[in-house]
Structure formats: structure tokens, C-alpha cells
Amino acid sequence: MSHATKEFLTALEETCARRRDEILGSADEITIIGQTYYVSNDGDDGNDGLSPERPWRTLRRVSEAPLSEGDGVRFRRGDLFRGGVDTKPGVTYAAYGEGDKPKFYGWDKNLADPSLWELWDKEHRIWHLTEPILDCGTLVFEGGQAHSRKLIPSYRDGGFVCRDDEGRPFHPSAEMTRDLDMVCIIDGRLTSHPSKGENFPIPIMDGESLGDLYLRCDRGNPGEVFGDIEALPRRRIFAVGGNNNVTVDNLCIKYTGEHAIAGGGGCLRGLRVTNCEIGWIGGAIQHYFGTDPNYPEGGRGTVTRYGNGVEIYGGCDGYTVENCYVYQVYDAAMTHQINTCGGFFGLRNIRYRRNLVEYCVYSIEYFLDKTQGDTRSFMENCEISGNILRFSGYGWGQQRHNTHTPAHIKGWSFENTARNFRIRGNLFDRAAYRMIHLVAREEESCPVMEDNVYVQRLGLPLGQYGANAEAEPPILVFDEGAEETLRAIVGEINPTVYGVE
């Protein structure tokens, strides 16, 4: 093991800054073989969109357009678009022009407007947003200089109650104890669909569930205190669904409480995400069913939060995330995952390459949870290579009950049947908990590790690796013997290890 000197850490910061600048400055080199359509802030949806001089204006026009496979939509650099895009099969979404990557933000407007806020509780300095809003993962102030702590009350007996004491009604005035605390109260639509053996009414959470947002702001009206307030609403920005062969290239996708780019189904083919900036993602409430596997003690009425940068939930064949800068994500920067529930899913030909990931709870996540008798599902030909993965568990997503889950590579401890799975040439730079969590039922399903660099604080966990058919592998410690541990237990070929005092 080498010790990470001040000079080493300074050089590491410089390397990451160069990588970040390279990604943010990526040229528009992607080729569109079909018809190209253009979109800009000063366009008109009545235009045909067929040239930069006759662009469309809105994302709704893009979503509703009858695009064909091979077509592409280019958004003007320097422009800001709000809302989401319903993608079409075989279509490329990219940039044109000069300047910064075109920006896609989740909510309809910036909230730094004094007229959007009214004083709700003078004594406790709590402000109410005057317009209805979707559930939000958090609020981000001044481009990331500060963010809110989201409170997540449970719902029982027709009202909100405190998560840690369900016998105590939730009152914002009593529970919002810190500056910039926020809570969303959304219970206009209820469902009795059963969960956890119960069927009492709980709030419906979907794209139509609007309600009230409350924010504690000790310095006054938030719209006067801050010049920039972005909400992370429960909304996907690029909804891929089951559309095959979608490409998203050279876009900046930020501020959404669900997923930046989301696909899934039986077998999603050919999703490519390249040269993108993705930040401040996730944290919205998925549901109140109480089925969060990381909070098994929670009953019906407790929340599950979620939100990933790029996600495939289901089978896939040909899935690439490459040369992207992803940061401040509530869950994973990028992930492929499925609970099979007795079905058959193949997750094939997956590539996560040359990305820079910072301040996410999971830099890269995968899992294959084979349940209800499934014995056939598998992962095959997975490559995680050339990535710089930094500060797992040190971002805003740690405002969660399960603070022991962060990892740079998070495979959890499921069956995770896999073949030809390689993790090589990556830099793992500090994690609040495990650096790696690579467990499968059988040892041969664990990834081959080669030429990876590990930088971690001495005494913190290195992680877990190995088979769990008989027992869960132990959590390994990152200590002076970490290099030997990596060679002997993880089977890492040619590791490079730096300890941080």
C-alpha cells in the first residue's frame, strides 16, 4: 500500500478536473441517418423543425412528433428546456450549435420568485409554495451551494404521522427544526391497493399527484433570499420505457426527483447514453406501500424514495453509458436491475465506460434478484472500465435511514447469476461505507477484478466480495493490508492501493 500524500491528492483533483472539462466540452460528433429536427427556445411549434432556422420550441412538440427509426432531434446549445421527453424507438436526442450543452430541468419554473411564496408560520419561519407541485426529492439553491433536508412522514389513519413515532401526528411547525427543511404534503388521491397484509388508504404517487410544499427559510422569503431555486419533481426527463435503440448524447439533464433517463421491460435493446452531464437527481417518494427492502421494519404507509441517473429496470441487450459526468444522485448514477418475480430476464452486453461519477450513493449499481421460482435469468457480458468513481455516500443522498449502504459498485447480496463480468481499470476514490459490494450466490458469478485503483480512508470498509450460498461474506476493512486483501479475497489482478490518513 502507498499512502496518499498531499501531492498525490492534489494531482488526483487535477486529473478529475481535466476529465470533467473533457466531458463538458465534448464535441457533437454523432451521426443521424434519418431526418433531423431542431428545437430552440425561440422556435415555434408551428414550424416544421427541419432546419435551425425553423425550429420547434417545446418538449411537448418533440414528444408528440411522429418520429421514425433513424431520425434525430437536436436541441440548441445554451438553451434551457423544462419538463420531460417521451422518446421514440430508434431516435437520437442530441445537441447543435455553440456553447454549453442544452439543459433539461425537471420542474416547470425556477422557484426563486418572491410571489411564489407565502409566510405560513411566522414563529417557525416556514413558507408555503403558492402553486401546487409534484412531490420533490429536494430543493437545490444557487446551483448546488445548498440543498434542503426532505422530511418523509408516514401516512396512517387518514393523516400524516412521524416516521419514527407513528403515534405522533406530523405537524410541520414541530418537525421542521432546521433551516431549509422541506416537506411535501400530497394526499389528494388515495388507494387501498393492499401491501404488507393491509389495505387502509394511502396516497397515490404518480405524475398527476400534486400537493403542497413547505420550506423553512430562516432568512425570509425564499424567493428574495435566493437567486436560484430548482425543485427535483417526481418526473422522468427522458422516458425511454421499452423503446429500443434510443440514443441520448451531449445533453445536460438535471433537477428531477425520479430518473434522468429511464427504460425497462422484458428486453430493452440498444440504449446508449454518451457525453452527457447528469446531476441532482432523485429522492422523490415512489410509494407509501412500506415495501422498501432497506427498511423492512416499516409498515404500510411508510415511504420508499428512489431516483437514478440512468436506469434500466428489466432485461436488456446492448446498454451503454459512456463518457458522462454524473453527480449528486440520490441512488445510483447508472444501473441495471430487476426483481424477476418468477419471470425470465436476460441482462446482456452492458458497458459502463470512461464516466466520471461524484457524490452519488451508488456510483454504479446492478442486481438480479431471482424470486418466485426463477432459475433461468442471468447477466452476461458486463464491462465496467475506465471510470473515475468518487465520494460515494458523501452527497445529498445520504439524507436516508439506510446510511450504511453506499458503495462505488453496488451489487447488493442477491443471486446475481452472471458470466463474463469484468471490472477493470477504474479509479475508486473514497466511499463513506463500502467501496465495493460484489456478492452473488455462486463465486463464479462475481466479477473479475483487474487493474483497479483504490483510494480510501484507513479504517473504513473496503467492502464485500464472494459467494453467499452458505453465508454472507464478511465486510473487509481498508487497512494497511488492503492490497493483500484485494489479491487474496477479491482476486484483484494488479491492484493499486492508496491509504488516506
Feature locations, PLM:
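Right-handed parallel beta-helix
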Residues: N244-Y255, L268-G301, Y306-E311, C316-Q337, ...
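Extracellular beta-strand/beta-solenoid scaffold signature
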Residues: L111-I126, K196-I202, A231-F238, T256-G265, ...
